[in-house]
Every structure is written in structure tokens, then in C-alpha cells.
Curated annotation (Swiss-Prot):
It is found in: Cytoplasm. Keywords: ATP-binding, Cell shape, Cell wall biogenesis/degradation, Cytoplasm, Ligase, Magnesium, Manganese, Metal-binding, Nucleotide-binding, Peptidoglycan synthesis. GO terms for molecular function: ATP binding; D-alanine-D-alanine ligase activity; metal ion binding. PROSITE patterns: ATP_GRASP, DALA_DALA_LIGASE_1, DALA_DALA_LIGASE_2. Belongs to the D-alanine--D-alanine ligase family. Its EC number is 6.3.2.4. This is D-alanine--D-alanine ligase. Coiled coil: none annotated. Residues 116-311 form the ATP-grasp domain. It comes from Pseudomonas putida (strain GB-1). ATP binds at residues 142-197.
Length: 318
């Protein structure tokens, strides 16, 4: 990774990026995280000499993009309206190149159910699941999947609305809570074992990170607030298992069509088998975030990481 980036950096002219809009903030439930990510990206690009226009995305976005004469966009919006294909579609219509995955991959990755269906169709391991739309669905899932289970809104990130449940009564309550965030709610089998997160950048898989938290799972607090979350790089797997995880990550990303950069969350069960949970096409870039951590392990500082992401928009979209 370092040598590949060094080659890129040696020929990189930041002026060639033109006027870059950093799109951040927005109206999703992940707005606060996006504001922090955006501030870090804006600082890194500005320090590197890039001509940056910071746009906290609101109702005036179209007018801003047109009046500011934007040449390309760095999308650091998290959640709906930024990560789900809609922003990518707008930028495509305006002819503005942008970072990250395209319309289809963004929409697929934002939809946890569709992501799982694609992976299942290709024999890529992902936990058994059910869709919840009623109390009777909860009871049926209890019977078919057993406990413990984890409940998730289908289109939210940052672990928003998620809950681990150990009984049918808890499942009904968790479904009702998750439904406040999303009309579509999933429940998955709980995988007992360590969790890993793996970042991808410019077609390469970065060093996997093993996660440890005293929380029930790697929730919003553990991701962005708590100081007791543990991160291990190297991840502690033997070389064969780590390569298996890297290969599985590449295969899973190819199945969805991930471009530029992203991050995959994976569990390992007590038998050593890996299970894919979800993929994130615009991961966090805060001081607690995992992609910058993985990039550092690969030899890239934060500014180099941000420039590499932006440079990929030139390679893929001109």
C-alpha cells in the first residue's frame, strides 16, 4: 500500500482536483458524526493546498453546487441522503465527479437486507436473518432463529437503533424501537466471538482491526464516545486466517460493487468461521474512526488517506 501511494503522491498535483466540495452534515440520524468527519477532511485537504468549499448539506445544495462552480465532490455524509445513492445520482446528473462508490453500490450497501441477499446468492457467509413487520414476525423469528438475536434498522448506520435481545418479549420491544428509525427492520442470529473491521482503499484491503468493547456490542457509544474500546492491529489471527479474511472482504466488496474506499464488518464464530455483517461506503473519519487507524497501519497518515480517496475520484470518474 505504501509503495502504491508513494507512486501516486509523487505525481499528484492537488491543483488538478480543481474546486472540491466537501459534502458533510446533512439531515440523517448520523449528522453529528458526519460533521466531525467533515471537519477533519476539510482541514486535511485545506492543509494540502486543495481549493475546498465546505457544504453542510441542506435544502440549498443544488444552488450551492451550481453557484460555487464545483469541479468534484468529496462525499463524507453518513446515512440516508448521502450514502444511499441519492447524492451520487444528483452528482451524476450534474456531471460532477465524486468520491466513493457509485449509485447502485451505494444504494445496495445502505440496504442491509439487499446486501445480505446478494451475498447469500453468491455463497458468501452472512448470519441467518428475518424481516420484522409485526409482533407475529417477532414470534416466528424467535422460533426459527433462537436466541440471542440482534435487531437492526435496515437503512441506518453507526449502530443506531440496534439492540441485542434474549427473549421474545425483548424482541418485540426492540423491533418497536428500531421501527422508529426505519420502516424495515431486520433481526439476525447473534454470532458469539470476536469482531473485525476491514477497510478497503483504491482496490486494496488494509490491515484488519480486531475490536474489543465492554459494551454488549460495538454500539454508537463504543464507536464515537467511549475511551474503553480496544483496537488490535495486527488483529491476532494467524497468517492463514488473516488471508482468508482479506480474501473474503475483497470478494464481498466486489459483489456489491464497492469503489474507492469502504469498510466491512465481520464476526468470527466459536468454530473460527467468518460471518459478514454489513459494508459501509462512506465510513467515519473522526478521531475514533477505524479507516484512518487501518491506513496508519498501512503507512498512510490522515492527509495521505484523504488525498488517496480524492485521487480515486479522478481515476474512476475523471
Amino acid at each position: 500500500m505504501t509503495s502504491a501511494y508513494d507512486k501516486l503522491h509523487s505525481t499528484l498535483d492537488v491543483k488538478a482536483f480543481g474546486r472540491v466540495a466537501v459534502l458533510y452534515g446533512g439531515k440523517s440520524a448520523e449528522r453529528e458524526v458526519s460533521l466531525k468527519s467533515g471537519a477533519a477532511v476539510i482541514d486535511a485537504l485545506t492543509t494540502a493546498g486543495v481549493d475546498v468549499v465546505a457544504i453542510d448539506v441542506g435544502d440549498d445544495l443544488l444552488a450551492r453546487l451550481q453557484s460555487e462552480e464545483i469541479d468534484r465532490a468529496f462525499i463524507i455524509l453518513h446515512g440516508r441522503g448521502g450514502e444511499d445513492g441519492s447524492m451520487q445520482g444528483l452528482l451524476e446528473c450534474l456531471g460532477i465527479p465524486y468520491t466513493g462508490s457509485g449509485i447502485l453500490a451505494s444504494a445496495l450497501a445502505m440496504d442491509k437486507l439487499r446486501t445480505k441477499q446478494v451475498w447469500q446468492s453468491l455463497g458468501i457467509p452472512t448470519p441467518r436473518h428475518a424481516v420484522l413487520a409485526s409482533e407475529s414476525d417477532c414470534l416466528q423469528a424467535s422460533t426459527e432463529l433462537g436466541f440471542p438475536l440482534i435487531v437492526k434498522p435496515a437503512h441506518e448506520g453507526s449502530s443506531i437503533g440496534m439492540a441485542k435481545v434474549n427473549s421474545a418479549q425483548e424482541l418485540v420491544a426492540a423491533w418497536q424501537d428500531a421501527a422508529k428509525y426505519d420502516s424495515q427492520v431486520l433481526v439476525e442470529q447473534w454470532i458469539h466471538g470476536p469482531e473485525f473491521t476491514i477497510a478497503v482503499l483504491r482496490g486494496q484491503v488494509l490491515p484488519p482491526i480486531a475490536l474489543g468493547t465492554p459494551h454488549v456490542f460495538y454500539d454508537y457509544d463504543a464507536k464515537y464516545i467511549a475511551n474503553d474500546t480496544q483496537y488490535r492491529i495486527p488483529c491476532g489471527l494467524d497468517s492463514a486466517k488473516e488471508q482468508e479474511l482479506i480474501d473474503l472482504t475483497a470478494r464481498a466488496c466486489d459483489a456489491i460493487g464497492i469503489e474507492g474506499w469502504g469498510r466491512l464488518d465481520v464476526m468470527q464464530d466459536e468454530q473460527g468461521r467468518f460471518w459478514l455483517l454489513e459494508v459501509n461506503t462512506a465510513p467515519g473519519m473522526t478521531d475514533h474512526s477505524l479507516v484512518p487507524m487501518a491506513a496508519r497501519a498501512a503507512g498512510l497518515d490522515f492527509q495521505q488517506l484523504v488525498l488517496a480517496i480524492l485521487a480515486e475520484s479522478v481515476a474512476t470518474r475523471g
